[in-house]
From Swiss-Prot:
Species classification: Bacteria, Pseudomonadati, Campylobacterota, Epsilonproteobacteria, Campylobacterales
Name of the protein in its database record: DNA-directed RNA polymerase subunit omega
Catalysed conversion reaction: RNA(n) + a ribonucleoside 5'-triphosphate = RNA(n+1) + diphosphate
One of the protein's GO biological processes: DNA-templated transcription
GO CC annotations on file: DNA-directed RNA polymerase complex
Superkingdom per UniProt: Bacteria
EC number: 2.7.7.6
Length: 71
């Protein structure tokens, strides 16, 4: 799936709020870089952490609530 399609799906998950999406992706990418386990099947050696985080949001695996709670 193309990045544009994933981004469109992720935006729908956060109510089309680009600020929320960027916050969620940035925090989740940081967590992934610090050793968190990806919630989607992704080859972390071939994908950037931000792309994995975006895919997690698009699939509804993570949202703003999880970021605020510190998960």
């Amino acid at each position: 799936m193309r990045t544009e399609q994933i981004t469109a799906r992720a935006l729908k998950q956060v109510g089309d709020d680009r600020y929320k999406l960027s916050l969620i992706v940035a925090k989740r990418a940081e967590a992934l870089a610090n050793g968190a386990i990806a919630l989607v099947d992704a080859d972390t050696s071939k994908m950037k952490f931000a792309d994995i985080a975006l895919l997690e949001v698009a699939e509804g695996k993570i949202g703003l609530e999880a970021i605020v709670e510190g998960k």
